[in-house]
A protein has these predicted regions:
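Charge-dense polyanion-binding interfaces
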Residues: 125-144, 149-152, 442-475
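An N-terminal alpha-helical hairpin/helix-loop-helix interaction module that forms a charged
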Residues: 2, 10-13, 28, 63, ...
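Short, hydrophobic/amphipathic alpha-helical patches that form generic packing surfaces
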Residues: 145-155, 394-412, 449-453, 552-571
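PAPS-dependent sulfotransferase catalytic core
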Residues: 457-551
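Cysteine-centered catalytic environments shared across enzyme families
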Residues: 1-232, 240-287
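Short coil/turn segments at secondary-structure boundaries
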Residues: 164-165, 415, 445-448, 462-467, ...
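ATP-dependent adenylate-handling active sites, centered on carboxylate activation for C-N bond formation
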Residues: 4-7, 180, 192-390, 411-458, ...
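Structural motif
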Residues: 137-144, 385-396, 441-442, 542-560, ...
Length: 572
């Protein structure tokens, strides 16, 4: 059984912090045991690790990464004056004359959690703090979020309500102020992206500015590292970045990798053969040897049930590494610019959002615990009402930005010696997306148009999944390639697969390890769990089916069972 009281600090370039406005001696003792530095400012106390220094008014603690004028700023650091952009992945704590100001990046990819008296980047720290004061209560309906629908919608938290009652995830468009022993959530107008239809000219104005932003981000990354890779697929999001590199004449400043196979790989090699670049893989110069069970404990310490699925990369026992820090550029976050969920079946017959539709759609799952369902649906309905937008499409895009994008493309357990960069994070690209009518935005034409700005020919080359003919959709600018799909000639021999240096090292079967844990948890849940419906015949049959298919959806049951036992044991 995982020890949920054991805290593992965040990897670089991040630090961890907790702000307490209650002057709790119990919390002070807990944080001292964790070797956090501390400082009182205006009757509030901040605890932080990694940075051992006194804090002064006007200084800012920075965690994560972002872009400066021509480089990349990496944390953890403390600075007085620094011109940073808001398009990285970070959070900051500024020591203000009246208290503290806590902010995160433009898309909120570095989540912040808070309640009436506490703020932290780590939900587990708030759990430990509340537990020390005997002020802990749980949001037991949280289990329902795991089974609300059977797809990526519920691979992470789905409401602003966390697993701890009274503790919320900070909204993407807000920041926090600590003043006079109180915590205030304030709307940040620079991050409050409203949906408002605008003209074709306005759309392309934003799009061209977004192209400049993305080029700047790419330049900053390339100027900061000589060990940079571009993850290129046959899809549309990473193609934007490849097209940008061709426009900047910097395809030779990155090494291109692709883990995709078949048709996808054929397209990627064809693009590189025609438009330039070189394939390579990171050097495997040493091994990080770990322990599956400890890695799993670290995983739950970091996410503390905010993320439901368990990616293998976070728990594997053998991880090849490069001696030099790797900068990996990917097409992450492209899904925030169109309705990602619509293509996987989450939609409504009605265009206009109605909170009653939340109840009718999300209570369909036969695997939900009916005892907790009503409370969960109330929380989900409240979350949808709070999200930006008036239509179902707009609400789902906003939900994706708040939750799926945060915990899938952000909030990462940073790999040793590697930082994943997302240059598609762009203020102007978001403005361009949100000035389009729903049906046009959801065609995903924005990535096509942006690729076209960088390299018109690349935009019209074939994709892994055929795209629509955008010349027949409004907001189109004419091209000599309209109506065409330019063929790609695969060049598979461009990829020279390197023989793994450590191929003789025995690795455990992660899926088998998960099955062992799942079986143990099912046994424990019969006597130690709060939710015995997880052991029902219906769920057991579902688990057996998932195991037979080696489906990663068993992760949902592992997390749900851990939650059930965790709730019951802490209640006792």
């Amino acid at each position: 059984m995982i020890n949920f009281d054991k805290f593992y600090k965040s990897n670089d370039p991040c630090f961890d912090f907790l702000i307490d406005v209650s002057s709790s001696k119990e919390i002070d003792q807990v944080m001292k045991k964790l070797n956090f530095s501390s400082q009182v400012h205006k009757d509030a106390k901040i605890y932080y690790n990694k940075l051992v220094l006194p804090l002064h008014v006007g200084e800012t603690l920075f965690s994560g990464y972002t872009y400066t004028k021509d480089s990349v700023l990496r944390g953890p650091i403390c600075y007085k004056e620094c011109a940073i952009l808001d398009t990285g992945e970070y959070y900051t704590v500024k020591i203000d004359r009246e208290g503290f100001i806590i902010q995160n990046d433009i898309f909120g990819r570095s989540p912040i959690y808070y309640c009436q008296s506490l703020i932290s980047n780590r939900l587990q720290l708030i759990y430990l703090a509340l537990k020390s004061r005997a002020a802990l209560d749980f949001n037991k309906s949280y289990i329902c979020s795991i089974f609300s629908v059977s797809n990526s919608f519920c691979q992470q938290m789905t409401t602003y309500d966390t697993v701890i009652k009274g503790v919320s995830k900070l909204k993407q468009r807000e920041f926090l102020i600590v003043k006079e022993n109180k915590i205030y959530a304030i709307t940040d107008t620079k991050k409050d992206f409203q949906f408002q239809e605008k003209s074709v000219d306005a759309y392309y104005y934003y799009l061209h500015r977004a192209a400049d932003e993305i080029s700047h981000s790419l330049n900053s990354i390339l100027n900061s590292s000589d060990n940079t890779f571009l993850a290129l697929t046959g899809g549309k999001d990473s193609r934007v970045l490849y097209a940008a590199l061709t426009a900047m004449d910097r395809t030779n400043d990155v090494r291109i990798i692709t883990n995709d196979i078949g048709y996808d790989r054929a397209i990627v090699t064809g693009l590189v053969a025609k438009f330039g670049g070189n394939f390579d893989f990171p050097q495997e110069e040493n091994l990080l040897l770990g322990n599956f069970n400890i890695n799993l404990e670290k995983y739950y310490s970091h996410y503390f049930f905010s993320k439901i699925n368990i990616p293998e990369v976070y728990v594997k026992d053998v991880l090849p590494m490069s001696d030099n820090t790797i900068s990996l550029i990917g097409g992450y976050c492209g899904g925030v610019y169109y309705d990602f969920y619509k293509k996987i079946g989450i939609c409504s017959d009605k265009n206009r959002f109605d909170k009653s539709d939340v109840f009718s759609f999300f209570q369909k799952s036969e695997f939900l615990n009916q005892d907790f369902l009503d409370e969960y649906l109330q929380q989900l309905s409240k979350t949808f009402q709070d999200l930006t937008g008036e239509t179902w499409s707009q609400k789902l895009i906003s939900h994706y930005l708040e939750f799926r994008n945060t915990f899938h493309f952000g909030a990462r357990i940073n790999k040793a010696n590697q930082i994943d960069f997302a240059p598609l994070v762009s203020r102007n690209l978001m403005l361009a997306s949100r000035c389009l009518p729903d049906v046009i935005r959801d065609s995903a034409r924005i990535s096509f148009d942006l690729t076209k700005i960088f390299n018109e020919e690349i935009a019209y080359c074939q994709y892994e999944i055929p795209i629509v003919d955008f010349s027949k959709i409004p907001y189109h600018k004419r091209s000599k390639y309209d109506g065409l799909v330019l063929p790609i000639v695969p060049k598979l021999d461009l990829i020279k697969n390197r023989t793994p240096l450590f191929s003789n090292i025995r690795k455990i079967d992660i899926f088998k390890e998960k099955i062992k844990i799942l079986n143990n948890l099912l046994t424990l849940n019969k006597t130690l769990g709060l939710d015995d419906s997880l052991n029902s015949e219906k769920n057991i049959k579902r688990i057996e089916y998932l195991v037979s298919k080696r489906s990663q959806n068993i992760d949902k049951y592992i997390t749900a069972l851990y939650l059930s036992i965790f709730f019951k044991c802490n209640r006792a």
